[in-house]
Amino acid sequence: MSGQTFNPERLMQVILSPQISEKATFIGEKHNQIIFRVAPDATKPEVKAAVELIWKNQKVEVESVRISNVKGKEKRFGRFMGRRGGWKKAYISIKAGQEINFSEISQGEVK
């Protein structure tokens, strides 16, 4: 699996946004992990390659990726019940001593 090559344009679409919450901050400090919202069809190897491509200037090395599907919540619209859309999130473990700086993102220049 490590020998796979991915389309850089696809990798730039895999990670949608960082998940910023109290729980995400706690996990980040305690376990050296970052939580991202990812595309619904993203796979673990794609997420790993996307993180390493986007933050290649910082030489970030991903140790592991765990992916979870989050169900949408049921919400009431007046007297009708509706459902918000579900989404997928990825827990990215990076090597000890490394951190991701969100202000230094490369645009995925491939040579």
Curated annotation (Swiss-Prot):
Enumerate the UniProt keywords alphabetically.
Answer: Ribonucleoprotein, Ribosomal protein, RNA-binding, rRNA-binding
Q: Which GO terms describe its molecular function?
A: rRNA binding; structural constituent of ribosome
Superkingdom of the source species: Bacteria
Task: State the disulfide connectivity.
Answer: none
List, alphabetically, the NCBIfam families matched: PRK05738.1-3, PRK05738.2-4
Subunit relationships = Part of the 50S ribosomal subunit. Contacts protein L29, and trigger factor when it is bound to the ribosome.
This molecule's function is given as: One of the early assembly proteins it binds 23S rRNA. One of the proteins that surrounds the polypeptide exit tunnel on the outside of the ribosome. Forms the main docking site for trigger factor binding to the ribosome.
Q: What is the recorded name of this protein? A: Large ribosomal subunit protein uL23
Organism encoding this protein = Nitrosospira multiformis (strain ATCC 25196 / NCIMB 11849 / C 71)
